[in-house]
Amino acid sequence: MTRQSTYSRDQLLASARGELFAPDSGRLPNDPMLMFDRITEISDAGGTHGKGLIRAELDIRPDLWFFGCHFIGDPVMPGCLGLDAMWQLTGFFLTWIGAPGRGRALGCGEVKFTGQVLPSARLVRYEVDVSRVINRKLVMAQTDARMLVDGREIYTAKDLRVGMFTSTENF
């Protein structure tokens, strides 16, 4: 498939099945672990570091799977799912630029949670800025990201790292 600058939910689910890019390329997780509904912008230029950016959105509905179990009587989106979305987007960026292999989260520097996503929210927006791409034996991207709910920043993460591996046997 030709690189695009936006992707619909159906296209993202095709990525999970290995149908969007080359069959042996990186994949997004399938439902329910896919943590965004669309990519509204992706570019290998721009962003705060001038090395690329990814913008994505998740529509919040009270019936989302995690609200029913986290927590009963006090529903809130787990913070780790927002963080995972940032890793998912970083891995998608690597696949989108043509990096071979399967993506794996390698860590991050600093993470801050200053708010929460409740069932009454409408929209989560992710803004991921690529700060570094290493293209050697290991292909890796490093990004800085933030997550906004209804326009208010609630999570930030610095130095998110995702690597691409042609074999994950000994990972």
From Swiss-Prot:
This protein's GO CC annotations: cytoplasm
Coiled coil segments of this chain: none
Subcellular location, principal: cytoplasm
GO biological process, one term: unsaturated fatty acid biosynthetic process
Record InterPro entries: FabA, FabA_FabZ, HotDog_dom_sf
GO molecular function terms noted in the UniProt entry: (3R)-hydroxyacyl-[acyl-carrier-protein] dehydratase activity; trans-2-decenoyl-acyl-carrier-protein isomerase activity
Family classification: Belongs to the thioester dehydratase family. FabA subfamily.
Name of the protein described by the UniProt record: 3-hydroxydecanoyl-[acyl-carrier-protein] dehydratase
Origin species: Xanthomonas euvesicatoria pv. vesicatoria (strain 85-10) (Xanthomonas campestris pv. vesicatoria)
Gene that this sequence comes from: fabA
